[in-house]
């Protein structure tokens, strides 16, 4: 479960589990962080980079990804291998620093674990930028992670652990249902 992945699935993990008559566990939701895709200024995208619309941008992005798939990974791995020990040490420190910076006051353990994953993405992206792999300005990976984290937290609806939030929701439901009895 040490994987990070993206999915273009239209159904959430919770939806898939429900269709099989199951429920998701809190740990599953922390390992498979679901970020809503319509968090940008243009639906799924924040910028269209001079293109006329989201569809044109999406088609161009897909074509470029198909053509360039994997090329930056090789460059990144080669750059990392040049001084793996120093890069690993720096990444660990950056992940810790970024996670502390991103973690809201009162966040539960599950949110903290998810934020560690966001911090990993930010730190790896910033390192890739410093190594000349991305072509992005410094700080862009962290900015993008902040956008995704904000969307994830808003979608989640609370900072606590899932079990605690479920208990509170049950109590609220009971009080609401029996408030006039």
Predicted regions and their residues:
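Extended alpha-helical interface modules used as scaffolds for assembling large macromolecular complexes
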Residues: 1-4, 9, 13-181
């Amino acid at each position: 479960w040490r994987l990070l992945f993206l999915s273009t699935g239209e159904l959430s993990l919770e939806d898939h589990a429900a269709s099989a008559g199951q429920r998701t566990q809190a740990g599953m939701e922390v390992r498979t962080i679901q970020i809503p895709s319509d968090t940008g200024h243009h639906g799924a995208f924040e910028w269209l980079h001079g293109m006329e619309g989201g569809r044109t941008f999406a088609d161009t992005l897909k074509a470029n990804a198909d053509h360039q798939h994997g090329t930056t990974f090789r460059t990144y791995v080669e750059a990392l291998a040049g001084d793996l020990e120093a890069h690993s040490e720096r990444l660990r420190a950056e992940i810790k620093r970024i996670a502390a910076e991103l973690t809201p006051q009162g966040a539960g353990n599950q949110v903290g674990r998810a934020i560690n994953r966001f911090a990993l993405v930010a730190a790896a992206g910033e390192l890739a930028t410093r190594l000349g792999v991305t072509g992005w300005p410094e700080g862009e990976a962290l900015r993008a992670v902040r956008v995704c984290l904000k969307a994830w937290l808003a979608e989640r609806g609370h900072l606590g652990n899932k079990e605690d939030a479920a208990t509170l929701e049950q109590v609220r439901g009971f009080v609401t249902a029996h408030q006039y009895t």
